[in-house]
């Protein structure tokens, strides 16, 4: 029964968007008729979809469900037109803005680590600040007192702690307003609008990457924490649109390849439905093959799967496969 309940709960967003598979159409509605909590959650999702999609015109033909979902993700209020590298961040920000009204009266709900919903938004305010400062955007919180020589992991953790402590002295609405304003400023920056302006490399979080890639990192974190908050509130959050998901995957593969280095036992790594890469040494034969679903791979990189539990397919040298999985899991900073 628990498995059936959890399975239906994961389908409620698709139900609200009218995007259920035919087989699910036979199971979800009967469950909603019997389960008061799922029915209430489903109705909240439906209200959100109506708000995002705007008033319906009865003079226009009904669109396929997949088109409805794509349109919602593209046209959520406040999502600006940006260059392709910033589009995943714009969508993730819009998604979190759409979810946060559901947190009203529930800001103290535990989410992840020792954070509640309020603290999770404060963390995102602190996390986005690093890129914002680099792009000349004014800080929304008191200046950092962390010494310049501190390692990035220490600085990252302490800044989050300081900002959370500061934001606990303010209302959740004030924290959300500052996070939202900072995100909007990032998306209005020249670097978000022009790929050429975002091509130069900068060092953030210990990684020297083009500014364009740092926008994708921001998208990754915003989506992961949106999913965290959704789970805490009992709401299923849809994954990123496919194009955006693949941008996250490709960047994560590049970072994983750098982390493994050129001497690691070579593994042919593939993501279901997409590309494949050789990770590790290019000077010796491939020792193993590893296949992951794109969403599971992102959740592994994001610290929401462990190397032991992430679903995967593998052949060949198990030690080489294990090395890739453990290195991927070790990259999580979220």
PLM region descriptions:
Residues 1-13:
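Short, charge-enriched, intrinsically disordered boundary segments that mark the beginning
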Residues 1-4, 53-88, 95-98:
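Positively biased amphipathic helices and basic secretion/translocation or surface-docking motifs
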Residues 5, 283-334:
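C-terminal interaction segments
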Residues 10, 24, 105-150, 201-256:
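Short, contiguous alpha-helical
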Residues 19-44:
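N-terminal amphipathic alpha-helical interaction or autoinhibitory segments
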Residues 46-51:
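Short cysteine/histidine-rich zinc-coordinating motifs and their immediately flanking basic loops
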Residues 78-146, 270-274, 291, 302-305:
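Conserved small-residue-rich
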Residues 126-127, 159-221:
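Contiguous mid-protein beta-loop-alpha structural module that forms a pocket-lining wall or clamp
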């Amino acid at each position: 029964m628990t498995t059936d309940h959890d399975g239906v709960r994961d389908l409620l967003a698709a139900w609200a968007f009218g995007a259920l598979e035919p087989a699910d159409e036979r199971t979800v509605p009967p469950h909603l008729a019997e389960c008061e909590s799922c029915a209430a959650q489903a109705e909240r999702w439906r209200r959100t979809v109506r708000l995002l999609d705007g008033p319906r015109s009865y003079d226009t033909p009904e669109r396929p469900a997949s088109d409805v979902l794509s349109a919602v993700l593209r046209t959520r209020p406040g999502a600006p037109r940006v260059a392709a590298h910033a589009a995943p961040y714009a969508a993730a920000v819009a998604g979190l803005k759409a979810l946060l009204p559901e947190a009203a009266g529930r800001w103290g709900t535990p989410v992840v680590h020792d954070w509640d919903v309020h603290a999770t938004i404060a963390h995102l305010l602190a996390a986005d600040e690093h890129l914002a400062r680099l792009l000349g955007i004014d800080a929304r919180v008191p200046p950092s007192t962390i010494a310049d020589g501190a390692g990035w992991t220490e600085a990252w953790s302490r800044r989050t702690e300081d900002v959370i402590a500061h934001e606990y002295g303010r209302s959740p609405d004030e924290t959300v307003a500052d996070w939202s304003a900072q995100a909007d400023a990032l998306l209005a920056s020249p670097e978000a609008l022009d790929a050429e302006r975002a091509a130069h490399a900068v060092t953030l979080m210990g990684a020297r990457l083009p500014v364009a890639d740092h926008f994708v990192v921001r998208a990754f974190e915003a989506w992961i924490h949106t999913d965290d908050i959704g789970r805490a509130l009992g709401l299923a959050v849809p994954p990123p649109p496919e194009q955006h998901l693949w941008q996250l995957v490709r960047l994560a593969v590049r970072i994983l390849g750098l982390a493994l280095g050129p001497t690691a036992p070579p593994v042919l790594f593939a993501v279901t439905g997409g590309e494949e890469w050789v990770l590790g040494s290019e000077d010796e034969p491939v020792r193993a093959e590893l296949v992951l679903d794109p969403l599971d791979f992102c959740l592994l990189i994001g610290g929401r799967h462990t190397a032991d539990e992430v679903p995967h397919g593998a052949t060949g040298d198990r030690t080489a496969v294990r090395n890739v999985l453990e290195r991927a899991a070790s990259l999580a900073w979220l």
